């Protein structure tokens, strides 16, 4: 057996050498520099080890190779872009030349084939994007949801006041509660178990795993999708089946629940209901899948980036008390010490606005941006970006470039304010949410929610590390990155501020939750 393997390997190596010797000389410009390609597998062994923050690993390419570098895996060229201006030129200004979505076999196996990250049916992709743009793609559209945001954020303050040690849980719950209310008209359980909320959280965690770069061998060797699950090394088949069951339930349960409500005459306003009433959707049709995935994208896309940004904000406030003090001083001066700011105050709060930008710059929610595929050969700075190459922007290097941002590792909102002798530094909103037609459609949700949470949290709480000597936390690897464990003290500024936080209980008492109804619906339809 071993001799057969050696003979096969030798034959493949011989064919590879023969191909290189006999191939006609390529007169095109060279690819961007990069690590040496090994025969057959190329740079497969040059990907970051598991558990390594991918953006830091690839940032080393900028040090070694400059603003662009290249790799190759099984014939697939990968171009790492480590310079913000280059990224804007290639993927935004020339977005029509690189708007294709990379193939992701594992994501399709795991049931995510209709996601905006993978959907290659151009019409379906355009429909989902258009629906999202209409509902949440502009600040004007988002403004219709401001009252819901304000109530949800005040409830977040109350949860944090009552149980500050569970801050991360409260951040996640608030983010998902808002998106599920907007998308489905669904009210989550304020306390206790909620099947639909749990299902959404499970899907978000699986999303990060599914799309983690270099995680799945089947993405490099698509033929492996046909290997049975019992075959050695094919455990990805079992994972794919598990993830597929989760996402099918997460997308279909709220859709069927709303259809059931319509039939019973008790439906509530929601994005899904509005879209459902616009047309007829046959059960199991492609149009129905486009509809349910539109709303799945609303919920997951608008919540995970918000959780990351808000978590980073709280860490920054604990690590940089002087920034927290300046933000509080501005709020007390402009809004009042015991009054909560509203969205209408934003233009009067330049330091808070700069603070929001600095959160996005300091640690982008998605440190590696969404990949693009080139649709034709392109030449940049004397290097070839061949047709079909995968473009991968390292957003973290964009936001930590010392030639663009002074002291990039330091959290400093003042960098975005007009100075006597210096103009504001580059607004990170130009690239932290992606480029061109693949820009994050939920970016305004995250931006506006972070603004109001920052205002309310700084107005009402003192935020500090439990251990004053604790180092800055590590940020966890993944498509959406969040800070690692970092214990905080979050305490009310005064009894008056505690009373202000608790006023939500009388201003907007908890509504009846839908958790019991959805659990009964799922049990009745055997969806648990």
Swiss-Prot record:
The keyword Metal-binding applies. The keyword Lipoprotein does not apply. Pfam families: p450 (PF00067). Converts O-methylsterigmatocystin (OMST) to aflatoxin B1 and converts dihydro-O-methylsterigmatocystin (DHOMST) to aflatoxin B2 in the aflatoxin biosynthesis pathway. It catalyses: 8-O-methylsterigmatocystin + 2 reduced [NADPH--hemoprotein reductase] + 2 O2 = aflatoxin B1 + methanol + 2 oxidized [NADPH--hemoprotein reductase] + CO2 + H2O + 2 H(+); 8-O-methyldihydrosterigmatocystin + 2 reduced [NADPH--hemoprotein reductase] + 2 O2 = aflatoxin B2 + methanol + 2 oxidized [NADPH--hemoprotein reductase] + CO2 + H2O + 2 H(+). This is O-methylsterigmatocystin oxidoreductase. Belongs to the cytochrome P450 family. Pathway: Mycotoxin biosynthesis; aflatoxin biosynthesis. Its cofactor is heme. Its EC number is 1.14.14.117. Heme binds at residue 440. GO terms for molecular function: aflatoxin B synthase activity; heme binding; iron ion binding. The lineage of its organism: Eukaryota, Fungi, Dikarya, Ascomycota, Pezizomycotina. Keywords: Heme, Iron, Metal-binding, Monooxygenase, Oxidoreductase.
